[in-house]
């Protein structure tokens, strides 16, 4: 946990494997804290928005990118945006297309918040991001469960074939999990088993955020 003394906003990072329940627990905390801090005082930022722009590459080249490696992400821009939000400045968050494998021309404007929830697979691998967090979480969901969830999500929501999902899992998802993501849980303040519906973990996180807000 960072000893960050900037009180403009509280940043909570939620990391873990793809389809481990990060988005679910982030959205649950977001929805349940809105009544406490106000609709416009809490926001969620997904690390996926900061995949590097690949518009200069052909589609064939884009699909070969290893999206589970830290080099695929623009963490420098993410850090800059978080620092701007902590200074009370609005930022333009990129939007990423999972079907085009690059950023779109649109941006999402985020105004300063009291609480920002970050979620993404590689957040805890970067010391710059860890230093900006007031609390960090790792979703410790078994990989076989993550794979089943990911396959269903990517086929239903992202236009992928089952064959391409399993091929990507074997070539990059699992190896990168073992090399980068799983070791990063040593940096987490809280390790959450059983996925995003872990009610005790949700309540602990909400209570901790509430304490930080009162500090």
UniProtKB/Swiss-Prot annotation:
Family annotation (Gene3D superfamilies): P-loop containing nucleotide triphosphate hydrolases (3.40.50.300)
Keyword 4Fe-4S applies: no
Keyword Transferase among UniProt keywords: yes
List of residues binding ATP: 16-23
Pathway, per record: Pyrimidine metabolism; CTP biosynthesis via salvage pathway; CTP from cytidine: step 1/3; Pyrimidine metabolism; UMP biosynthesis via salvage pathway; UMP from uridine: step 1/1
CDD domains listed in its UniProt record: UMPK
One GO CC annotation: cytoplasm
SUPFAM superfamilies in the record: P-loop containing nucleoside triphosphate hydrolases
Record-listed E.C. numbers: 2.7.1.48
Catalytic activities: uridine + ATP = UMP + ADP + H(+); cytidine + ATP = CMP + ADP + H(+)
Keywords: ATP-binding, Cytoplasm, Kinase, Nucleotide-binding, Transferase
Subcellular location: Cytoplasm
UniProt-listed InterPro entries: P-loop_NTPase, PRK/URK, Uridine_kinase, Uridine_kinase-like
Major site of localization recorded for this protein: cytoplasm
Pfam family, one: PRK
Broad EC category: transferase
Recorded superkingdom: Bacteria
HAMAP family xrefs: Uridine_kinase
Protein name, per record: Uridine kinase
Originating species: Aliivibrio fischeri (strain ATCC 700601 / ES114)
